[in-house]
Every structure is written in C-alpha cells, then in structure tokens.
C-alpha cells in the first residue's frame, strides 16, 4: 500500500470519529440521558457527597407535544383525559417517562387553570335500560326440556336417543342424582 492510500484511510477514520462525536448526543434518548446524568453527578459531588440535591429529577431537552404522543399514551391509559396526558408530556418531555409514571400508578393532575369537564348528569333511566339490566336468571330445566320427574327413564338406552331426547334424559338423570344426594 502506498503512502497516499494510507493517508486516505487515516483521513476517513478521523472523519468518521468526528462525525460520530458530533452526532452522538442527538442520536438516541438514552445517550442524552447518560450525558445529562454524568453532568449532574459531576456538578453535585461537592457538598452533597455524590447525590443530586433537590428532587433528583433529570431535566431533559423537551420536545414539542404532538397528537401522536398523546395517542400512544392514551392507547395504554384510555381513562386519562387528553389534557392530563398533554400536561404530563409537557412536564416530562418523553412518552416513555409518562408511560412509566402511569404504570407506577402515579396521579395525573389536570393543568393549572384547567377545569375538568363535568360528565352530564344522566337521569334514573339507567336502571330501565335493557342493556344494563342483568339478564342472568336461573332456568328451570324441567320446564325448558319438558321433563316429568315422575317418569321412569332408567330403561332407556342413551346412545339410541336423538339430540332432544338426550337432553331430556340428561336433565332427568341429573334430577334423580340430586334427589339421591339430598336423601343421604
């Protein structure tokens, strides 16, 4: 390899290192977090003994909050109001931090000066709404399948019955077993 090729490769290597160094802090949020943490720890090593003073919250460069960020958080926390999410995103500047706060169970306050919307008062018609009424009720299987408990079906062969007759037979057999258990 001649001298010009070696010089060219060395120049490419130096250029690559410089470009990586300039782009490093803007490339990934975790890289920004690491540089901010090291900056805070080096500033606070004096009187605090290595611990950050105050709340210990790390200040990150904030991004403007857009609707996509709110939708991501609302997908995980649908019961939160969009203003609560927007306020927390403006404070934290990060969807990840907001989601972590939600998963930890922290409160999401409304922004100062914002009044929470009052849900409209619904009249007492909710109880008469057929969709909200409990439709679960016990069925009387003897009446439903027209089974006479006094009838003797013990001589009937189960495999020879059609579907409806099998249902009646199973209800009759269950009734007889229940009567036998209650007499014991």
Swiss-Prot record:
Q: Determine if Transmembrane helix is one of this entry's keywords.
A: yes
Q: Compositional bias (Basic and acidic residues) spans?
A: 128-145
Give me the Lumenal side stretches, as residue ranges: 1-2
- What Gene3D superfamilies has UniProt attached to this entry? 1.10.287.4310, DNA helicase RuvA subunit, C-terminal domain
**Transmembrane domains' residue ranges:** 3-23
Here the segments flagged for biased composition (Pro residues) are: 109-122
User: What does this protein's UniProt record list under function?
Assistant: Component of the endoplasmic reticulum-associated protein degradation (ERAD) pathway. Recruits the soluble ubiquitin-conjugating enzyme UBC7 to the cytoplasmic face of the endoplasmic reticulum membrane where it functions in degradation of misfolded or regulated proteins localized in the endoplasmic reticulum (ER) lumen or membrane via the ubiquitin-proteasome system.
Q: How does it assemble?
A: Forms a heterodimer with UBC7.
* Name of the protein described by the UniProt record: Coupling of ubiquitin conjugation to ER degradation protein 1
